[in-house]
């Protein structure tokens, strides 16, 4: 299974090895979630100020966060579904704060690789419709995260 991922590094800090890590873990997740070949998403790396702006503008939370997901498959009010056109599946956009990922890796006592992989996977699962608004949903999403991280070798 192959995902098409467009990476944008606004921080100019992200090494190729981290891009490859995310490509591989999301590929593994797509395989385990049975996502069709050719599905697309973008991953943008930003600083804390930029993610704070996005969080404020789109979620009414004026503070930095670690990852934000914008799912393309959620129908907004007044949007029309396009039918009968063969287009690749557009999953959406992930925005990851690199400084926040570094802070959290240190805070949780694990590697930056593991934190970055976790954040990318967490956001990816949101793009697929997983959520953690209820206790039941949280159990399902976090259980799936753990399964995929362990299958990829990034378990705790």
Swiss-Prot record:
Subcellular localization(s) per the UniProt record: Cytoplasm
Binding site for Zn(2+): 122, 126, 132
Signal peptide limits: none
GO biological process, one term: rRNA processing
Cofactor: Zn(2+)
Coiled-coil positions: none
One GO MF term: zinc ion binding
Co-factor binding comment: Binds 1 zinc ion.
Main location: cytoplasm
Keyword Zinc: yes
Enzyme class, spelled out: hydrolase
Annotated keywords: Cytoplasm, Endonuclease, Hydrolase, Metal-binding, Nuclease, Ribosome biogenesis, rRNA processing, Zinc
PANTHER family attached to this UniProt entry: ENDORIBONUCLEASE YBEY, CHLOROPLASTIC (PTHR46986:SF1)
UniProt-listed HAMAP family: Endoribonucl_YbeY (MF_00009)
UniProt function note: Single strand-specific metallo-endoribonuclease involved in late-stage 70S ribosome quality control and in maturation of the 3' terminus of the 16S rRNA.
Assigned protein family: Belongs to the endoribonuclease YbeY family.
Record protein name field: Endoribonuclease YbeY
Organism from which the protein derives: Bacillus anthracis
């Amino acid at each position: 299974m192959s995902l098409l991922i467009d990476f944008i590094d606004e921080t100019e800090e992200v090494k190729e090895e981290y891009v490859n890590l995310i490509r591989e873990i999301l590929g593994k997740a797509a395989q385990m979630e049975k996502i069709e070949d050719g599905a697309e998403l973008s991953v943008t790396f930003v600083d804390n100020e930029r993610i704070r702006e996005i969080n404020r503008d789109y979620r009414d939370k004026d503070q930095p966060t670690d990852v934000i997901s914008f799912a393309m498959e959620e129908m907004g009010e007044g949007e029309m579904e396009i039918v009968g056109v063969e287009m690749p599946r557009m999953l959406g956009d992930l925005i990851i704060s690199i400084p926040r990922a570094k802070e959290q890796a240190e805070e949780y006592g694990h590697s930056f690789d593991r934190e970055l992989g976790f954040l990318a996977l967490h956001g990816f699962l949101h793009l697929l419709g997983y959520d953690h608004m209820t206790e039941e949903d949280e159990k399902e999403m976090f259980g799936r995260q753990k399964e995929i991280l362990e299958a990829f070798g990034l378990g705790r």
